[in-house]
Curated annotation (Swiss-Prot):
Gene: NAD2
Its EC number(s): 7.1.1.2
Membrane topology: Multi-pass membrane protein
InterPro entries: ND/Mrp_TM
One of the Pfam families matching this protein, by short name: Proton_antipo_M
Subcellular location, record wording: Mitochondrion inner membrane
One term under GO cellular component: mitochondrial inner membrane
Family per record: Belongs to the complex I subunit 2 family.
Protein name, entry field: NADH-ubiquinone oxidoreductase chain 2
GO MF terms held by the record: NADH dehydrogenase (ubiquinone) activity
Amino acid sequence: MLYLLLTTTLLMMTWNRYAGRIAFLSLLGYFVIMLNIWLHFGSLSESVTLLFGGGLVRLDESILSALLFILFLGLVIMNRTGDLGWEFHLLLMGGLTGAIYMLTAYDLLLMVVGFEFLNLSTYLILSLYRGTETATLKYLLSSAFYTTLLLLAISFFYGLTGSTGYDALFVQMNYLGGETFLPQILLLGTIAFKLGLVPAHLWVPDVYDGLPMTLLSWMGSVPKAAVLLWLPTIYPLLNQLAPFLLVLSALSFLLSAVLMAAQYKMKRFLAYSAIGHLGFVVAAFAIGDYHAYGYYIFIYMIATLAQFVLLSELPQTELMKQTSVLKDHRALGLGFLVIVLTMASLPPFAGFYAKLLVLFGFLEIGYGIFAVLLILASLRSAAYYLKWIQTTFFSVVPFASAPIQVQYPNLVSFLVTLILPSTLLLLL
């Protein structure tokens, strides 16, 4: 990926007029190569794991699936932002490179390299637009603090085990017991920040509110997807903290259900919506239900990217009111309706089945209290999404309906994914 990044950078600097096309085609070519490797892995009768660089890098079918999903998100974002300068596409590919290193790393030090590469690219992407300085600074300072916690956690793990390799760490964790509690807490704090879980969620509404929708399509998808897909790899480092993680996830979706009612700005509403959904996702991880976990990640990321792509088509002033113009644009209006109903987790849309799997996971292990909390939070959140639909389609349009450019390939692909849960049930 680094060679591709360097080659693409030279091409974009030479023909910066076609930077968007060059970056998209380069990333598409890399996606096709990874897809071919994934198909080769899938054709084997036995599960195969490849190690490179003396065990620093690990590659298997599940990691390849995660990489393909990350690259798919990057392709959608790049296709939507093809008119931006070559600097944006360079940083976007740099962020994807960091995510790839983070997911394939089998050593904490190499993971940190990918983690920081992704962070640095995100900082610079957020600073590209005028007016985003405050949001970028808030995210930068908060991220710097929690990155320090991550480095402290790694230093403690190394001091206790004498290694940063995952294999050695996983073996030593079985013998150290409570001695690793402090580094696990530090690691959990960093994860909570990156995902916006309570109590490390305060940056999310402020940063979302200060960014344009184009940048939110990156901020709300790739960095969070990278962390979510990385969590199963390091689960042995967090096995003692599963109850804490479950409590944080429950607090997140409960807080989201309560505070969504007080939001009159679209982006802050979306921020608290993200906090709630990520709480549900992490709850599935905390109870060890990887089936529900992977399914929810897939549905949530597709729906999130779809809503940002759609909302970025609207005039960005008083966005909560501007959605009412969608009733004059039937294609976008239908897309908006499907996306919101998916985020509200109403049947027969795919978001309902994702949340239902988490509910069944709670019931199977006897966590009835958490199941009740999930139902109550889901019902309360769904009411706010339905109110959003009511405002959009049944209120008076406050502004003249402006012409909106519809990207039909993106719209159709998102609708097929979200409106046909029967096809997604094949994944169950």
